[in-house]
Design a protein with these regions (language model features):
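Short, positively charged, Gly/Tyr-enriched micro-motifs
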Residues: 67-163
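Short, conserved DNA-binding cores of transcription-related domains
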Residues: 1-76
């Protein structure tokens, strides 16, 4: 996956979703090649801070250098989470009143537990990516997601967070 900070969206009436276009140069985070070709789109749904369902069409790109396929994610998307980054930050910072309606205590507890485990994981991985950017468990969620996703260190399961 490639996480981008600069992007724009274009809404498509017939798809009922927004295409996400990167506004910054893309490069493969495995081989650092900038020779990427568009390979299609993938649908991704998010729940926003105000409780709306946001449907995004995420671009897939193929690296001609190493043959890997990457998803180009905007930094508002936290990989493998159903809420957008702004909603997760509101929960983490203890502002559940900003969180979407219908978010129960169990879900709030689950997000906070994930973030606690993520803090330990970030502490262990920060040394590995220190030459790219300085991140700590106190860094903003956007910076942590971008750094770890682009370094291919984003944990796919909770067991990865707790390992080591």
């Amino acid at each position: 996956m490639i996480n981008v900070k600069e992007y724009h969206t274009e809404y498509s009436e017939d798809k009922r979703a927004s295409y996400v276009w990167a506004d910054e140069p893309l490069s493969c985070s495995f081989c650092d090649s900038s020779d990427l070709i568009r390979k299609g789109w993938r649908s991704r749904k998010l729940i926003t801070l105000i409780g709306n369902l946001l449907c995004l069409l995420i671009q897939r790109v193929l690296c001609k250098g190493c043959g890997r396929i990457h998803h180009v994610l905007p930094d508002m998307v936290v990989p493998y989470k159903r809420y957008d980054a702004e909603t997760i930050e509101a929960i983490i910072e203890g502002e559940p009143e900003k969180a979407p309606c219908g978010l129960d205590e169990t879900e709030i507890h689950r997000v906070k537990a994930w973030w606690r485990d993520m803090g330990f994981y970030v502490s262990r991985k920060a040394a590995s990516v220190a030459n790219k950017i300085q991140i700590t468990p106190n860094s903003k969620l956007h910076a942590i997601v971008r750094t770890l996703a682009n370094a291919h260190m984003w944990p796919r399961t909770r067991s990865v967070l707790l390992a080591e």
